[in-house]
């Protein structure tokens, strides 16, 4: 029961990232628009008083604020999209359902617009009168104040309706409403039922949330910030931190803005106070991230690099530099945290405690800095330094330096004292055992604990992604012995790095689990193994040319541990400068991943090359890519393979660095040319 709930919470947590991802853009508009009204800035730059500039800044401020004002609706649509695999019908159903749910609650409880503003009648101060109202005006609908929770509930229900009814068949005379068209209809019915239920169930829940909010924020806020920091970091490995911090950011606490509107949630209150130009009282649950993200974790990365074995320092240095810079600039810490989370849990325990103290120290010092994305340098500039007189952002720098020193010496001491297997200090890998192509999916399934142990099965171009029921049944060493370059464990989620064949293994495993294919007999396997084997290996010398116009970098500098660690093979990193990827040699297209972000090629001499366009671009679901070729198509060197929208990738992917990997280098030598500036006619590698 718990594991089932945990799996669902993981999916909800991932779904919440979609609406949260909108906030940085809205926050930037709001921050810049507000900064252009700042009196001190206007004194320095009087041209900001120009009517056109004032209008532009007002538009920017309003454009950013409207996003924060309508977060519940965005959470409804975003949650539905995330849980329904990105289908737009689910988003439409969530939008319709959210409106109907609110209208239903308003009618059942006879809420009117007069009720919404009755809190102000007879009150001495609006802020006192509207402190904890139970009602709200949502998109012009007088209804209960359910906040982002209402949006999440309706989004999850709309996704459930989609997954349940998207392929429903109806009688011929109702055929027009069959399939996906039925989803908004059934969601409307579910929304009415939900509205009626919440009309009676939500008020006591709301009272409980208000009581909890008052207790946490008013009884001992200092202790609360410390506990918040510890729990928030502790949930990172399980992917549940988004669920945990959402009530603090979007619901707990209240503030009445200058327009007389009630604003709830630490992050939303900070943004409202930014716009109103008043002293900041919010930010207790965001500010604590800045010292350890900008200073502490990069120092920890240096400690890990320092303790790597000499022969591994170059690779580890590239990984740690990339991860440390990412944490400093953007506040994205997972690449760095996951590098030591599972191999050295004691380090993560130290990190969690220090994160808690960071929130506590920032609160005690009265530093109040908001954020929309994460606690990196970019947010620090926008929400801290631009408002330094109100946020006290300058204090982050000396505090951060202290945290950098503490992180470095604690990590360095723990690594040496406990002989921790941090990156660059790992044991040698297990030797790979033979498994025929036909038998490999069966062996992997067995190593994962059998089909009864598989909760969810997926793959991308580089790794097999499996959510298991019981992690103790998984034979990690066995998976590595079957050819996986590495196995990453995140909670009950296993990622086995099988390279380009990962997707095929997934499809075969799915067919095995559904009974479509059966295990080959031992006789067949023996015959396969005893007959003269078919080797896919390069014959002679193969010249490999640049896959486009751009820059060549060492593979160790690619910002992804799987590629930089050469888990899939050796090669180079390519930074494209034009949106066209071309064939590096004459050969055949062997694979085009469904999301178009990766291409597998085989040269006429048998050299297999994987071109993986960007990092984590599988999550773009094909957006930004246009394939110009088909699987099994013959191509010539410099022939265009893929058109890429580089601007879109830069905005939506962690990096446009494109690993180019030779995946079958066994018994062959790879010579990498000393080339930096590349074009399709330039030789960059040779396989001998």
Swiss-Prot record:
GO molecular function, one term: protein-phosphocysteine-sugar phosphotransferase activity
NCBIfam families: EIIB_glc, PTBA, PTS-II-BC-glcB
Entry's transmembrane regions: 12-32, 81-101, 137-157, 182-202, 223-243, 284-304, 315-335, 340-360, 364-384, 395-415
Name of this chain's protein: PTS system glucoside-specific EIICBA component
UniProt-listed PROSITE patterns: PTS_EIIA_TYPE_1 (PS51093), PTS_EIIA_TYPE_1_HIS (PS00371), PTS_EIIB_TYPE_1 (PS51098), PTS_EIIB_TYPE_1_CYS (PS01035), PTS_EIIC_TYPE_1 (PS51103)
Active site: 460 (phosphocysteine intermediate), 612 (tele-phosphohistidine intermediate)
Primary role: The phosphoenolpyruvate-dependent sugar phosphotransferase system (sugar PTS), a major carbohydrate active -transport system, catalyzes the phosphorylation of incoming sugar substrates concomitantly with their translocation across the cell membrane. This system is involved in alpha- and beta-glucoside transport.
Domain PTS EIIA type-1: 560-664
Domain notes: The EIIC domain forms the PTS system translocation channel and contains the specific substrate-binding site.
GO biological process: D-glucose transmembrane transport; phosphoenolpyruvate-dependent sugar phosphotransferase system
Domain PTS EIIC type-1, chain residue ranges per copy: 3-427
Record membrane topology: Multi-pass membrane protein
EC number(s) given by UniProt: 2.7.1.-
Keywords tagged on the record: Cell membrane, Kinase, Membrane, Phosphotransferase system, Sugar transport, Transferase, Transmembrane, Transmembrane helix, Transport
Compartments (UniProt record): Cell membrane
PTS EIIB type-1 domain boundaries: 438-519
Gene it is expressed from: glcB
InterPro entries, A to Z: Dup_hybrid_motif (IPR011055), Glu_permease_IIB (IPR036878), PTrfase_EIIB_Cys (IPR018113), PTS_EIIA_1_perm (IPR001127), PTS_EIIC (IPR003352), PTS_EIIC_1 (IPR013013), PTS_Glucose_EIICBA (IPR050429), PTS_IIB_1 (IPR001996)
A GO cellular component annotation in the UniProt record: plasma membrane
Major localization listed first in the record, in broad terms: membrane
């Amino acid at each position: 029961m718990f594991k089932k709930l945990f799996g669902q919470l993981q999916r909800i947590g991932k779904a919440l990232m979609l609406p949260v991802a909108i906030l940085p853009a809205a926050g930037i508009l709001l921050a810049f628009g507000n900064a252009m009204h700042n009196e001190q800035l206007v004194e320095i730059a009087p041209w900001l008083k120009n009517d056109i500039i004032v209008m532009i800044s007002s538009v920017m401020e309003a454009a950013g604020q409207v996003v924060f004002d309508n977060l519940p609706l965005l959470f409804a649509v975003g949650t539905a999209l995330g849980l329904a695999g990105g289908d737009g019908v689910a988003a439409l159903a969530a939008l319709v359902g959210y409106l109907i749910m609110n209208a239903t609650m308003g009618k059942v409880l006879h809420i009117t617009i007069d009720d919404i503003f009755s809190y102000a009648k007879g009150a001495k101060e609006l802020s006192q009168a509207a402190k904890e109202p139970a009602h709200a005006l949502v998109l012009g609908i007088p209804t209960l104040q359910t906040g982002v929770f209402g949006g999440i509930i309706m989004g999850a229900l709309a996704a459930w309706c989609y997954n349940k009814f998207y392929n429903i068949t109806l009688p011929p005379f109702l055929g027009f409403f069959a399939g996906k068209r039925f989803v908004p209809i059934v969601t409307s019915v579910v929304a009415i039922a939900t509205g009626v239920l919440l009309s009676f169930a939500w008020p006591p829940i709301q009272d409980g949330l208000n009581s909890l909010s008052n207790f946490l924020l008013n009884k001992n806020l200092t202790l609360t910030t410390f506990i918040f920091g510890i729990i928030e970091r502790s949930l990172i490995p399980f992917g549940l931190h988004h669920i945990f911090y959402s009530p603090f950011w979007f619901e707990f606490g209240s503030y009445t803005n200058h327009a007389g509107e009630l604003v709830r949630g630490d992050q939303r209150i900070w943004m409202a106070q930014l716009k109103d130009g008043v002293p900041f009282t919010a930010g207790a649950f965001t500010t604590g991230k800045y010292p350890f993200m900008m200073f502490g974790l990069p120092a920890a990365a240096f400690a890990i690099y320092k303790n790597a074995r000499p022969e591994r320092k170059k690779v580890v240095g590239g990984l740690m530099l990339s991860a440390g810079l990412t944490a400093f600039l953007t506040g994205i810490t997972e690449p760095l945290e996951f590098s030591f989370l599972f191999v050295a849990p004691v380090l993560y325990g130290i990190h969690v405690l220090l994160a808690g103290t960071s929130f506590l120290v920032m609160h005690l010092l009265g530093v109040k800095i908001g954020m929309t994305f994460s606690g990196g340098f970019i947010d620090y500039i926008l929400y801290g330094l631009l408002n330094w007189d109100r946020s006290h952002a300058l204090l982050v720098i000396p505090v951060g330096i202290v945290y950098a020193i503490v992180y470095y010496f604690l990590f360095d001491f723990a690594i040496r004292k406990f002989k921790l297997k941090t990156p660059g200090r790992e044991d040698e890998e297990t030797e790979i055992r033979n498994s025929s192509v036909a038998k490999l999916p069966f062996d992997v399934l067995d190593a994962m604990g059998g089909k009864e142990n598989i909760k969810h099965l997926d793959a991308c171009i580089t790794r097999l992604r499996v959510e298991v029921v019981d992690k103790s049944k998984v034979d990690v060493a066995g998976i590595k012995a079957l050819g996986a370059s590495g196995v990453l464990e995140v909670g009950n989620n296993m990622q086995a790095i099988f390279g380009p064949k990962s997707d095929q293994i997934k499809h075969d495993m799915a067919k095995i689990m559904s009974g479509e294919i059966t295990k080959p007999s031992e006789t067949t396997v023996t015959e396969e193994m005893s007959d003269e084997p078919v080797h896919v290996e390069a014959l002679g010398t193969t010249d490999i040319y640049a896959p486009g116009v751009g820059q060549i970098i060492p593979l160790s500098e690619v910002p992804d541990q799987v590629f930089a660690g050469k888990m899939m093979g050796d090669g180079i990193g390519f930074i494209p400068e034009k949106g066209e990827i071309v064939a590096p040699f004459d050969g055949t297209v062997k694979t085009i991943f469904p999301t178009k972000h990766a291409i597998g090629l085989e040269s006429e001499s048998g050299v297999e090359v994987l071109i993986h366009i960007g990092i984590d671009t599988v999550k773009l679901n094909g957006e930004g890519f246009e394939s110009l070729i088909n699987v099994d198509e013959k191509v010539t060197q410099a022939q265009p393979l893929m058109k890429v929208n580089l601007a879109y990738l830069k905005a939506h992917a962690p990096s446009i660095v494109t690993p180019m990997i030779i995946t079958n280098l066994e018994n062959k030598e790879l010579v990498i040319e000393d080339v930096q500036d590349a074009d399709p006619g330039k030789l960059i590698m040779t396989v001998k």
